[in-house]
């Protein structure tokens, strides 16, 4: 005879292999706080509806509080034979309060129970990630304000394109993180409905109040369809999608840190706090933190892909396949949270080599567009013609082995006789960035204003 809580139908014990593949406590033990919170709300509702006595509900609540304390203190024994967090908690509750524990599962199934637990867990995770992203944004915006006028090369195709400021570059990642926070907020809004009370799949004949349990757990409303309630994992997929995009953004910045810290580039330095050495090469300073952030992106995206594949062919309603929804997601969320904290630390730690940045900003004829713009504004030349003329001047400078601002005026006039000496005033990297005053442009005053705006918004959000 089976000794499982569901074992009344069975006359034999499960095979050992069945036990191994079926058990989930090693993963869903992390849902203990959410499971206990949902059980307390359910017990209170059952009592309010007259389904169980107030005395039983009180004892259940006290017992659950004891279990929460035991788990928090590390004094709780998780038993693999009980399969999951639900049965572990209920079994211990029975040891603490006796038969009244058996009334807790009235009008409830593990199907709606785990769906509720995991929604609460993901909601809590989103809140934690949002707070971490806000701190990341603050770090970037504060550094952007410090370096609103620090000139550096801007790149396209990883080739020097136009001068920008370091602050402007950092603010690009503030904007990305803002969109990431928006995606997480959207996911949170959609997940914030309660499956509790859907029971196995069809609802229950008991006169439960699903609105009461939804409100008690901070949900906006109960889910409207019991089949959907127990079989939906969109909320995990959507959150993993937001996490994947966020991880890609972190990875892009991490990649730049790896490139910029290379001695061949040398635009920034990281301190000993965020670098490691080599076991054989004493001189090495490796940007391992940035590299690991870059690598963790694969874990996050992999979790999204894995769960999409798990869910793609599942008929309604609950299937045991869904037990595989948690481990990858939990690991992905943990990896993302760590990556955000690491990038925040590096953002505060990195030191730009301002002289090297300025010198690099002028390489590769980066102010060529400024010359073309001058031809358009001053000589009223059509831009396409100005583009062609500038290209010929760049070719001439390249042939002579000089920068644009070093090319003699007479040489420029060989290409376009109408060019005057005041053209030299637009060819420095400083004048280039100062001229980019269009909204969203890299002009230092723009950057300082946007950085201050972000810091003000973030401070307001804290309150």
Curated annotation (Swiss-Prot):
Keyword RNA-binding tagged: no
GO cellular component, one term: cytosol
Catalytic activity: 2-(N(omega)-L-arginino)succinate = fumarate + L-arginine
Compartment(s) where it occurs, according to its Swiss-Prot or TrEMBL record: Cytoplasm
Keywords: Amino-acid biosynthesis, Arginine biosynthesis, Cytoplasm, Lyase
Pfam families: ASL_C2 (PF14698), Lyase_1 (PF00206)
Gene Ontology MF: a single term: argininosuccinate lyase activity
HAMAP family recorded: Arg_succ_lyase
Name under which the protein is recorded: Argininosuccinate lyase
Species of provenance: Bradyrhizobium sp. (strain BTAi1 / ATCC BAA-1182)
UniProt gene name: argH
């Amino acid at each position: 005879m089976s000794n499982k809580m569901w074992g009344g139908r069975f006359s034999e014990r499960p095979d050992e292999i069945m036990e191994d593949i079926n058990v989930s406590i090693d993963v869903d033990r992390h849902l203990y706080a959410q499971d206990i919170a949902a059980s307390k709300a359910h017990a209170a509702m059952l009592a309010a509806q007259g389904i169980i006595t107030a005395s039983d509900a009180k004892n259940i609540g006290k017992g659950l509080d004891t279990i929460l304390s035991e788990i928090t203190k590390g004094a709780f024994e998780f038993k693999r034979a009980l399969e999951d967090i639900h049965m572990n908690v209920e079994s211990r509750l029975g040891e603490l309060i006796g038969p009244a524990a058996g009334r807790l599962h009235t009008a409830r199934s593990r199907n709606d129970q785990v769906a509720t637990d995991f929604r609460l867990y993901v909601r809590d995770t989103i809140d934690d990630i949002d707070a971490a992203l806000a701190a990341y944004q603050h770090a970037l915006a504060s550094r952007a304000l410090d370096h609103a006028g620090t000139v550096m090369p801007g790149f396209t195709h990883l080739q020097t394109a136009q001068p920008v400021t370091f602050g402007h570059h950092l603010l690009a990642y503030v904007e990305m993180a803002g969109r990431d926070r928006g995606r997480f907020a959207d996911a949170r809004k959609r997940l914030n409905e309660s499956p509790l009370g859907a029971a196995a799949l069809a609802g229950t004949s008991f006169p439960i109040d699903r609105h009461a349990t939804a409100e008690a757990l901070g949900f906006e409303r109960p889910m409207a369809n019991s089949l959907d309630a127990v079989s939906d994992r969109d909320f995990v997929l959507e959150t993993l999608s937001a996490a994947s995009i966020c991880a890609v953004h972190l990875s892009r910045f991490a990649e730049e840190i790896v490139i910029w810290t290379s001695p061949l580039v040398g635009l920034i330095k990281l301190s000993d706090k965020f670098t490691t050495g080599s076991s054989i090469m004493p001189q090495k300073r490796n940007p391992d933190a940035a590299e690991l952030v870059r690598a963790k992106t694969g874990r996050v995206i992999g979790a999204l892909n894995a769960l999409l594949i798990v869910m793609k062919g599942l008929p309604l309603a609950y299937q045991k396949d869904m037990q595989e929804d948690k481990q990858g997601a939990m690991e992905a969320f943990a990896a993302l949270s760590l990556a955000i904290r690491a990038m925040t630390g590096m953002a505060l730690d990195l030191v730009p080599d301002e002289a090297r940045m300025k010198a690099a900003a002028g390489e590769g004829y980066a102010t060529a567009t400024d010359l073309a713009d001058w031809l358009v504004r001053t000589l009223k030349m059509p831009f396409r013609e100005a583009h062609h003329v500038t290209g010929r001047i760049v070719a001439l400078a390249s042939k002579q082995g000089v920068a644009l601002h070093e090319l003699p005026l007479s040489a420029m006039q060989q290409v376009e006789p109408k060019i005057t000496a005041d053209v030299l005033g637009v060819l420095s990297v400083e004048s280039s960035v100062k001229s980019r005053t269009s909204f969203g442009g890299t002009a230092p005053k723009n950057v300082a204003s946007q950085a201050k705006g972000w810091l003000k918004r973030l401070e307001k959000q804290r309150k």
